C-alpha cells in the first residue's frame, strides 16, 4: 500500500505517464525482453513478470554448507521450517562481501537487526529481474517484482528513498507515527507487531554473525 501511495503522488506530480516504459527509468532493462513493459502493465499485474525471485540466494555462501539448502522433509540437516512443505538448513553463512553484522561504508542497507546488505546488491536485484523468465503480457498474474520496479522508478523520479518519501508526505501528516517501512529506526522492538511466524528469518539474523 505504501508503494502505491508514492506512485500516485509521483503521477500527480507528472513524474511519469502510465504509458511510459519502465525501462525509461531503469535503463538496465533496455537490452532485455522487459524493455517494452509499460508502467500500467506493472500496476495492473499484467506484465508477465515472475511472481517472485529469491534474491537472498545470491548472498549465501554456497561453500559454507554441503548438500541441498532445502528439503521437503524435516531432518537433522534441515531443521528450520521455511513454508508448509519446505525445510531449510541453518548451518550456512553469508558472503562477507555482501552481508555485514554492522553498518560501515558500503553496507548501509539494514535488513534486520545487526544485518546490513552491501549497496551493490541493488545491481544484483536488477540483474536477476532482467534475466528472469517473462510470461504472457496482458494476462493478470500477481507479481511482487512489479512493485519492486515501481519503487525504483518512484525513488529515482522523486529523488528520495521510499521510507523518507512516505514519512514526509503521508505518515507524519496523518499522525501515523507508528507506521513506517523501517520501524527499527524509530520504534522499540516491543512496539513492532510481527507479521508472520518466520523462523527462517530469525535464523538469518542469528547466522549472519560469522560474517563479521
What role is predicted for each listed range?
Residues 1-18, 42, 147-155:
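Active-site SXXK
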Residues 2, 22-23, 130-134:
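General secondary-structure edge motif
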Residues 17-32, 173:
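Short, glycine/proline-biased beta-turn/loop segments that scaffold the active-site neighborhood
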Residues 35-204, 208, 212:
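Short, surface-exposed loop or secondary-structure junction motifs
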Amino acid at each position: 500500500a505504501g508503494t502505491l501511495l508514492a506512485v500516485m503522488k509521483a503521477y500527480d506530480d507528472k513524474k511519469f505517464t502510465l504509458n511510459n516504459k519502465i525501462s525509461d527509468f531503469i535503463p538496465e532493462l533496455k537490452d532485455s525482453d522487459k524493455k517494452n513493459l509499460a508502467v500500467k502493465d506493472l500496476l495492473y499485474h499484467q506484465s508477465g513478470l515472475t511472481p517472485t525471485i529469491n534474491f537472498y540466494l545470491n548472498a549465501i555462501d554456497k561453500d559454507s554448507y554441503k548438500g541441498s539448502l532445502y528439503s521437503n522433509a524435516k531432518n537433522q540437516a534441515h531443521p528450520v521450517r521455511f513454508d508448509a512443505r519446505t525445510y531449510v538448513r541453518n548451518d550456512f553463512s553469508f558472503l562477507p562481501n555482501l552481508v555485514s553484522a554492522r553498518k560501515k561504508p558500503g553496507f548501509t542497507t539494514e535488513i534486520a537487526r545487526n544485518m546490513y546488505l552491501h549497496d551493490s546488491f541493488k545491481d544484483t536485484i536488477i540483474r536477476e529481474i532482467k534475466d528472469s523468465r517473462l510470461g504472457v503480457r496482458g494476462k493478470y498474474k500477481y507479481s511482487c517484482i512489479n512493485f519492486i520496479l515501481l519503487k525504483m522508478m518512484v525513488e529515482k523520479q522523486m529523488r528520495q528513498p521510499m521510507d523518507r518519501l512516505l514519512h514526509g508526505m503521508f505518515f507524519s501528516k496523518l499522525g501515523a507515527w507508528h507506521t513506517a517501512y523501517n520501524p527499527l529506526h524509530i520504534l522499540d522492538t516491543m512496539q513492532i507487531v510481527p507479521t508472520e511466524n518466520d523462523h527462517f528469518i530469525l535464523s538469518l539474523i542469528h547466522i549472519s554473525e560469522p560474517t563479521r
